[in-house]
Regions:
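Short, contiguous alpha-helical
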Residues: 1-125, 164-207
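Acidic/histidine-rich alpha-helical segments that form the ligand environment
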Residues: 127-160, 177-188
């Protein structure tokens, strides 16, 4: 099946942003933007869980309980992500690289399932990663699943309201092409945040 013309630029943008974030996390190099490779060291566990300010929300062991201001650790397995029931605190707590990458991975994986899978997964089924290597691998797998789901879409699907049944957003009220656009925005802005946190970690005095 050929790609719907409207999907082509969105898929191209997704592929670019996904590759750029993966390279920024795993290395060994990253395209500087003009074709020049820049050396990148792999994300470490210490960096993954680094809390640059007091009161961060992060990914934590369920056995340790939620962090400051959070009331629950959401997710299956040994680790969960800090959160509260809606409405969330104002101002929003600062979130760690681990929190942001976990959130991004979850939204990709769950939306893939609610587009071309069982349409049943929830946040309680998602397993947050407690170490950097597992988190990067989980992100890559979730991005691959979302991309595969996009390849099932035709022009009719793109215009279908509620085609993606993801339960934690406005997907039920939106045509699918708007969900595809929104996921790209999530990837772009969280990817930029994650890249900045890597820079801050590199240059911050921590000892």
């Amino acid at each position: 099946m050929s790609l719907p013309p409207r999907l082509v630029p969105l898929l191209t943008e997704f592929d670019f942003a996904r590759t750029r974030l993966t390279e920024r996390l795993a290395g060994p190099t990253l395209d500087s933007g003009n074709g020049t490779p820049v050396a990148v060291s792999p994300l470490t566990d210490e960096e993954y869980l680094w809390e640059p300010v007091p009161g961060c929300w992060s990914v934590r062991r369920h056995a340790d309980g939620p962090g400051e201001g959070a009331t629950v650790l959401v997710g299956a397995g040994a680790w969960g992500r800090d959160t509260t029931p809606w409405p969330h605190p104002e101002p929003a707590p600062f979130t760690t690289l681990a929190w942001r990458l976990s959130h991004l991975t979850e939204l990709l994986l769950l939306r893939a399932d609610h587009t071309a899978g069982t349409r049943s997964l929830t946040r309680d089924d998602f397993r947050p990663s407690g170490d950097a290597a597992s988190a990067v691998a989980a992100f890559d797998a979730a991005a691959t699943a979302w991309r595969a789901a996009l390849l099932t879409a035709d022009e009719t699907v793109l215009d279908t309201v509620g085609y993606c049944t993801y339960p934690h957003g406005g997907d039920a009220e939106e045509p699918f092409w708007e969900i595809v656009w929104w996921v790209n925005q999530e990837l772009l802005h969280h990817g930029a945040e994650i890249a900045l946190l890597r820079d801050l970690h590199r240059w911050s005095p921590r000892h």
